[in-house]
Amino acid sequence: MFIYSSYTLSFAWLFLIFFFFKNKALSLRFSLSLISVILSNIALKGSLSLNAFLSSFTAPLSPFSCLLILAYVIFSCHMLKKPPLETLQSYSVMLFFHLLLLTDILGFLPFSIYHHFMASLIFSALFCSSLFLSSPLLGVIALMALSSSLLMHSHFQILDSLLDFPLLLFVFFKTLSLVQKRLY
């Protein structure tokens, strides 16, 4: 279910900027935050009005999705601090998720919606297959979420419908395995 709210990806970017630049000057953090909000919310179309800019803040991306994306970014940054990763599948899952997230973020660029849709579809299929190689159960759940999002034509958002539940499970089990390795 899609929730129309003011929680968009820009709030995740705001948190990441303030987290990674916590030792920098406050003016730099505010300027980077303003740039990220504008870039992640402006839709570059034929004409851009103030009303269109304000309505772009109510994108149909659920707050739960934003929290999961933020949790995954923090998880992947934590994993990259302690190389090497466990397996090649972990590398591929992280790589394809970041590519899928990048194509979703770059959706405001003025190229064809069809090409953006196809890129998201390709990266989500690669993400599902790499997730299936890492964990068959999570891969099947992700493939079911992808197919259900393809069947629903209204408010199509691959990232939202694909990653809510599988990403939560993936981050939970990976974190659990890391905790078990640290304890034993």
Language model regions located:
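Juxtamembrane/interfacial segments around transmembrane helices
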Residues: S90, A119-S120, V140-M152, L168-Q180
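Hydrophobic, membrane-inserted alpha-helices
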Residues: F11-L16, S120-S129, L143-L151
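Central hydrophobic cores of alpha-helical transmembrane segments
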Residues: R29-L39, L137-L150
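Loop-to-transmembrane alpha-helix initiation sites
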Residues: L61, H116-M118, Q157-F170
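N-terminal topogenic module of multi-pass integral membrane proteins
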Residues: M1-P60
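Membrane-interface capping segments at transmembrane-helix boundaries
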Residues: M79-K81, L176-Y184
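Juxtamembrane "helix-exit" motif on the non-cytosolic side of transmembrane helices
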Residues: I42-A52, C77-H78, L102-F111, L150-H155
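Membrane-proximal helix-loop-helix units in multi-pass membrane proteins
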Residues: S62-S135
